[in-house]
């Protein structure tokens, strides 16, 4: 027998339309105030977790009721996930936090087969969902006395900077010829791959977020949760193996030149990071404003290479999804994916992830071209580091090392 626990998050049962508001994502024009109602089904006698494996929320969008179904992203963290920061005297401190009961979810809207959702439920609902072909953002409103949330379309966020933003990769590498049509590629479970990544946050990010490591972590977790949704189309699982925060100073010279920073980061990874944390790919997240319109750069077709399986990404927007898409873009270059051209498509009217320019349009998915190029790169090169399937965090019955602290010079097995 199933007992249904109905939790009314707010007594208000009606939405409210607003014209302008300042939210975490920036100034938003034309938003809707909603009061989600949580409906959770628990088996009789089951222990209530802080964050259930599956949850449902009911609210209204444009006056129509919707049911948001969420399932915990259990593959988000590796079983030996670690976090690293540095003490004022330069000691490296490594922790292995318990991440089994995290608050990051993927999901869909009930009765909308084409819907998707990527949501943080840590403090209210924050993230995005696609409903009837439209991308909506949702986040709690800054009112301590209420559980009100704002729902709005991405296009209603006032742009921070109208200047075009671009990936620094140029189209000067060899393509895999001939390019097949998507229908000619055979898809089976043998094509599933698993990319364990480490995110390195530089000191400019620490300054940008006023030294608030919890805020930095939440920002990164939300990004990774978003890109796991995007990469499922390419049959690639993205798993976060580690998060390193350069809390006191940068360990490389982070320059406004994206090219120089990428080179330095790759060299540092090969001589340092790769020996401390098991991972396949590393990305540097920086608040440094790269020269010109560049907001990201990565080596192409370089997966598993110690120096070149890396990218650098500028934290260029207050909209988490936009930075996450930039991260997904640079990682795809490592997987042999090129910039989209005019014939590439990810749905009518949509801008695709591998567009060389980020503009005001909603960026949705990888294109058909990206799918083909990724599959052909994997088929031809078969990068070995992404073949092994890591254990998920929910398979670990006890913590590996609890919250063990390690100083510089001590290794973790």
Curated annotation (Swiss-Prot):
Residues 193-390 form the Peptidase M12B domain. GO terms for cellular component: extracellular region; plasma membrane. The keyword Transport does not apply. It is an enzyme of class 3 (hydrolase). Its cofactor is Zn(2+). Keywords: Calcium, Disulfide bond, Hemorrhagic toxin, Hemostasis impairing toxin, Hydrolase, Metal-binding, Metalloprotease, Protease, Secreted, Signal, Toxin, Zinc, Zymogen. It holds the Pfam family Reprolysin. Zn(2+) binds at residues 329, 333, 339. CDD domains: ZnMc_adamalysin_II_like. Residues 21-187, 391-413 form a propeptide. Expressed by the venom gland. Disulfide bonds join 304-385, 344-369, 346-352. Binds 1 zinc ion per subunit. It is found in: Secreted. GO terms for molecular function: calcium ion binding; metalloendopeptidase activity; toxin activity; zinc ion binding. GO terms for biological process: proteolysis; venom-mediated hemorrhage in another organism. Its EC number is 3.4.24.-. Residues 1-20 form the signal peptide. Belongs to the venom metalloproteinase (M12B) family. P-I subfamily. This protein is a zinc metalloprotease from snake venom that possesses hemorrhagic activity. Monomer. This is Snake venom metalloproteinase acutolysin-A. It comes from Deinagkistrodon acutus.
């Amino acid at each position: 027998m199933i007992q249904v626990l109905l939790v009314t998050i707010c007594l208000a049962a009606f939405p409210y339309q607003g014209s302008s508001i300042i939210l975490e994502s920036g100034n938003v024009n034309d938003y809707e105030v909603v009061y989600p109602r949580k409906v959770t089904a628990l088996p009789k006698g089951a222990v209530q977790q802080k964050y259930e494996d599956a949850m449902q929320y009911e609210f209204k969008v444009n006056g129509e009721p919707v049911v948001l179904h969420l399932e915990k992203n259990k593959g988000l963290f590796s079983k030996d996930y670690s976090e690293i920061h540095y003490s004022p005297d330069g000691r490296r401190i490594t922790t292995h936090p318990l991440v089994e009961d995290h608050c990051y979810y993927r999901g869909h809207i009930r009765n909308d087969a084409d819907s998707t959702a990527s949501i943080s439920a840590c403090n209210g609902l924050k993230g995005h969902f696609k409903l009837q072909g439209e991308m909506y953002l949702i986040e709690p409103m800054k009112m301590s006395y209420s559980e009100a949330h704002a729902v709005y379309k991405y296009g209603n966020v006032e742009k921070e900077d109208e200047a075009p933003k671009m990936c620094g990769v140029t189209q000067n590498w060899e393509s895999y010829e001939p390019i097949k049509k998507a229908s000619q590629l055979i898809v089976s479970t043998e094509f599933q791959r698993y990319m364990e990544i480490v995110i390195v946050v530089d000191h400019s990010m620490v300054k940008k977020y006023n030294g608030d490591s919890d805020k930095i972590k939440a920002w990164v977790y939300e990004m990774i949760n978003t890109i796991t949704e995007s990469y499922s189309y390419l049959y690639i699982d993205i798993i976060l193996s580690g998060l390193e925060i350069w809390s006191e100073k940068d360990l490389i010279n982070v320059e406004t030149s994206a090219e120089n920073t990428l080179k330095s980061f790759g060299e540092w990874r090969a001589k340092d990071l790769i020996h401390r944390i098991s991972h396949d790919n590393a990305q540097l997240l920086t608040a440094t404003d790269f020269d010109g319109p560049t907001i990201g750069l990565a080596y192409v077709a370089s997966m598993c290479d110690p120096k070149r399986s890396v990218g650098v990404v500028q934290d260029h927007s207050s909209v988490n999804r936009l930075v996450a898409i930039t991260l997904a873009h640079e990682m795809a270059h490592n997987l042999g994916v090129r910039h989209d051209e005019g014939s590439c498509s990810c749905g009518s009217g949509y801008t695709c992830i591998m567009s060389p320019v980020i503009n005001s349009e909603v960026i949705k998915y990888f294109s058909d071209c990206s799918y083909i190029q990724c599959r052909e790169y994997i088929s031809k090169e078969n990068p070995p580091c992404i073949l092994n399937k890591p254990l998920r965090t929910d398979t670990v019955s006890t913590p590996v090392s609890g919250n063990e602290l390690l100083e510089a010079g001590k290794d973790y097995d």
